[in-house]
Amino acid sequence: MAANDTISDMLTRIRNACMVQHDNTKVPMTRMTRNIAEVLKDEGFIENYTEAGEGIEKHLVISLKYKGRNRQPIIQKLQRVSKPGLRVYSNHKDLPRVLGGIGIAIISTSKGVMTDRQARKEGIGGEILCYVW
C-alpha cells in the first residue's frame, strides 16, 4: 500500500509497534524517514535502525527501545504537527518547547532534519514535522 504522507505512516508504524511491544518495525525508506530515524536514534528514543531491501522495496528496520521489567516503551507519544494539507513553519525564536524540554520537536530546516534545541542553537527555523516524548 502506497502512503501519501510517509512521515505520518512512519510515526503510526512506530506507535503501533510500541503499543504491542514489538522489538522492531519495518518502515518504507525515504531520505526524510531515514533522517527522522537518525534524530530519534541520536536522542535515545530508538535503539538503532538499519536499511534493508533494494530499489523500490527499500525499507528501514527500526529497533525500538523499552525500559524496566514490564517493558515500558521509551516513546510515550509521537504527534504529527505539519501535515500535507496544513504545513506548520516556525522561526528559531518561536520554536516550541515540548513538555518544558523533556520531549523534542523534530524540525526540517535548510541545514537538514534536527531537533528544536539544535535549531535554536544554530538560529534557524523550519517546518515542524512532529513532537516526540
Swiss-Prot record:
Keywords: Ribonucleoprotein, Ribosomal protein, RNA-binding, rRNA-binding
GO MF: rRNA binding; structural constituent of ribosome
Gene Ontology terms: cellular component: ribonucleoprotein complex; ribosome
Pfam families xrefs: Ribosomal_S8
Domain of life: Bacteria
Gene Ontology annotations of biological process type: translation
Function: One of the primary rRNA binding proteins, it binds directly to 16S rRNA central domain where it helps coordinate assembly of the platform of the 30S subunit.
Family: Belongs to the universal ribosomal protein uS8 family.
Quaternary structure note: Part of the 30S ribosomal subunit. Contacts proteins S5 and S12.
The protein's name: Small ribosomal subunit protein uS8
Source organism of the structure: Picosynechococcus sp. (strain ATCC 27264 / PCC 7002 / PR-6)
The encoding gene: rpsH
